[in-house]
Every structure is written in C-alpha cells, then in structure tokens.
UniProtKB/Swiss-Prot annotation:
Induction line: Up-regulated by nitrogen limitation.
Protein name per the record: Beta-ureidopropionase
Source domain of life: Eukaryota
Gene Ontology annotations of biological process type: beta-alanine biosynthetic process; cellular response to nitrogen levels; uracil catabolic process
Gene name, Swiss-Prot/TrEMBL: PYD3
Record-linked CDD domains: ML_beta-AS
Active site per database record: E137, K212, C249
Location within or outside the cell: Cytoplasm
PROSITE patterns on file: CN_HYDROLASE
Known pathway: Amino-acid biosynthesis; beta-alanine biosynthesis
The organism of origin for this protein: Arabidopsis thaliana
Phenotype on disruption: No visible phenotype, but unable to grow on uracil as sole nitrogen source.
Primary subcellular site in the record, as a coarse category: cytoplasm
Source organism phylogeny: Eukaryota, Viridiplantae, Streptophyta, Embryophyta, Tracheophyta
Family: Belongs to the carbon-nitrogen hydrolase superfamily. BUP family.
Keywords: Cytoplasm, Hydrolase
C-alpha cells in the first residue's frame, strides 16, 4: 500500500504494514507478551543489559503531537557509571515527514507548506528539551530528482537561504543545534548545485556544511543529473552538545564512509535519507546499526514518508513502464547505539518525531570493550587501497595450480 498525497494536500493512512504503523507495533499486537519480549530482545538488543527506558515527555509536546497528528516516541540510551567521568547525556531528535502539497502546486507554496508543517514538530522537540535535531534529506522540497526535469532546480538555495533563516530563529529560541539537509546552490562557484547538510548552532549561527559524498545511480535515483559527489571530505562538527557528523543517504551503503567519520572523532552520525520500500527496506534496519557497532558511535537514521506523485511520467532505465512516482518512502526513522541496541522505528507512513537521550560515554566504553580501533589494520588497508587506485593494480589472488587441469 502507498501513502498518497491527494489534490488538496491531505494524506491518507496508507503505507502501513497490515494496518500497523511499524513492524514493532505489528509484533507487539500479535505476539504473546512473553514471546514479544524475547523477539524484542533480538530485534532491538539490550542497552547496558536491559531494554531501553522510555522518556516521559512534557504534556505540551504530547499536545502538539495530538493536534498535528505526528508520531511521537522517546527512549533513553544509558552508559555504565564511571569513576573518572561524569555522564555526558545529550537529548537528540529526528524528524520525518511527507510533503505538504501536491507537486503540481506553486513551488513557493510547497516550500512554505513544508515550513508550516514542520514548525509544530520542531516546537515539540524544543519544548521536550532536544539539544540536537536532524531533518530528512532535501526536506524543503519533494524528492524530484527521479524526474530529471531541470525546473526542480528552483528549490535550490544558498547555505544562508530561506530555510536556514527559518531554522536559525528556532535554534536560538530552543538552544538547539539543527542539522538541515537542503539542495544547495553555490553562489560563489558558478551557481553549481550540491546535496548539502547545513549545521546550525544553538546560537543561531552557521557552524558549517557537509556535501553528500556518494551519489546514487540506481533505478530512479539518478541524482547526478542535478549534482555530483561532494568536496567537503568527512567533517565532524564540534558543538556544545557533542561531536556530530552527517552521512547523507546513499553514503550509508559505503562502510568506509562511516569509518571516516569515526576516525575524525564523531560521537553521533546522522543519516538523513530518502529511500523507498521496494529498493531498500530490508537493508534499512541493518546498515546504520552495523555502522554504530563497527565505529563505536550513535547513529540517527531518518527517512521521509509518503508517495510523491509528479506531473510528468518518467522511466527508470530498466525496461519497465513509465510511471509518475518513486514508490513509497517508508519512514521508519530510528536510533542505533554502539552497544548494538536500537530504538523501535517511527511510523512507516506518518510524520514523526523521535527523541532519545544518549550518554556519549557509551562510545568510549565500547571502544574499550571491543577494541575495534586497537585491532584494526589501517596500515594494511591503506597499502591495499593505495595499490587499488593505480591503473596497474593486480588483485592478490592465489590460484590452485591444478585449477585448470582436466579432470580424469
């Protein structure tokens, strides 16, 4: 089923799993409590030997969720108590959302509609005391890059453009760092477009930006029609609340991309995305969780929701009939921790805000426990990669000398 946007911009409750918001809700409703508890242990892991604790949120945040009909969930990751360090607890939020108006509406109305839709969700994060908030990939617009039509470039804006100004006021109001992934137009370099995350500080200042490292060329995701691979490396942004990084969408499929943010000292890595069910849903709960484990940091995974229908049909280069939509963006935003625990996912079809308290001491504790940094062989990997990028590279393959001998 798909979550459709009607001509008046209203959304229907399609896109569920057999009528349930998420896999976790389906299992909870249909398994005996003792069975669900065991399944939950295997699906979500254990944080410091126990299930994640629920956070009691202010009534004002709950009221905003009820009034504006968005999913609101909150859970807490703890760490072991240490003698030499105090807990370093930070409250982090993720927002997933559908577009506000049909893609046929005037572009300025579409953007303003999304601003208006997100304002109460950001307010809920603010009154709930969120310190760092991340929005979804290209949150100011429909994910129109499947169409290959140039007119969607009009949604691009400078780093200090309209969306940043909108969020700067909220960042100051709530003393909140906000990660804002946008379609950037680089005014100083020939007005080239980039897929960019703008990091807005809790004082309303622009801390910096990161441009998407890996650009997909898979099915409808032919984004290189609009922008190419980023040029910002793997920056980690030191904020008053902790060290954060942004691995934008398709970068989650590249383990070395995750590794690089970890080597630069990230404690939380956000993965703002736009991905659809048929293509990637079985991979979604695995990749970020694996990255959190392998790199000893927290990961926040965000995916938009809904089915965005475009005016003109397009093809995918796979011989299948032309169509007017990507498919269903399945939401399911969640957090993963370095100890292999993770939160239940947000709804598969509703707008949502996921809040988590994280004790960042857990990052070092799991570096010490597993010793992945200590036991890694970076010099060996570096030597192989240095050889691999040369034209005369020869794979290190040892063949059986009898491999091609005729059998008797």
């Amino acid at each position: 089923m798909d979550h459709m946007i009607s001509e008046n911009g209203e959304t229907s409750a399609e896109g569920s799993i057999c009528g349930y918001d998420s896999l976790h809700q389906l299992l909870s409703a249909n398994l005996k409590p003792e069975l669900y508890q065991e399944v939950n242990r295997l699906l979500l892991g254990r944080n410091c030997g126990r299930s994640l604790e629920q956070i009691v949120l202010p009534e004002s945040a709950k009221a905003l969720s009820s009034k504006h009909d968005f999913d609101l969930q909150a859970a807490s990751f703890s760490a072991d108590k240490e003698q030499m360090r105090n807990p370093r607890v930070v409250r982090v939020g993720l927002i997933q959302n559908s577009i506000a108006l049909p893609t046929t509406a005037p572009f300025s109305d579409q953007t303003r509609g999304i601003f208006d839709k997100l304002k109460p969700i950001i307010d809920a994060a603010g009154v709930a005391g969120v310190n760092i908030l991340c929005l979804q990939e290209a949150w100011t617009m429909p994910f129109a890059f499947c169409t290959r039509e140039r007119r969607w470039c009009e949604f691009a804006e400078p780093v200090d453009g309209e969306s940043t100004k909108f969020l700067q006021e909220l960042a100051k109001k709530y003393n909140m760092v906000i990660v804002s992934p946008i379609l950037e137009r680089d005014i100083d370099h020939g007005e080239v477009l980039w897929n960019t995350a703008v990091i807005i500080g809790n004082n309303g200042n622009i801390i910096g930006k990161h441009r998407k490292n890996h650009i997909p060329r898979v099915g409808d995701f032919n984004e290189s029609t609009y922008y190419m691979e980023g040029d910002t490396g793997h920056p980690v942004f030191e904020t008053v609340f902790g060290k954060i990084a942004v691995n934008i969408c398709y970068g989650r499929h590249h383990p070395l991309n995750w590794l690089a943010f970890g080597l630069n000292g990230a404690e939380i890595v956000f993965n703002p995305s736009a991905t659809v069910g048929e293509l990637s849903e079985p991979m979604w709960p695995i990749e970020a969780r694996n990255a959190a484990i392998a790199n000893s940091y927290f990961v926040g995974s965000i995916n938009r929701v809904g089915t965005e229908v475009f005016p003109n049909p397009f093809t995918s280069g796979d011989g299948k009939p032309q169509h007017n939509d990507f498919g269903h963006f399945y939401g399911s935003s969640h957090f993963s921790a370095p100890d292999a625990s993770c939160t239940p996912s947000l709804s598969r079809y509703k707008d949502g805000l996921l809040i988590s308290d994280m004790d960042l001491n857990l990052c070092r504790q799991y570096k010490d426990k597993w010793g992945f940094r200590m036991t890694a062989r970076y010099e060996v990997y570096a030597d192989l990669l240095a050889k691999y990028i040369k034209p005369d590279f020869k794979p290190q393959v040892v063949s059986d000398p009898l491999l091609h001998k005729n059998s008797t």
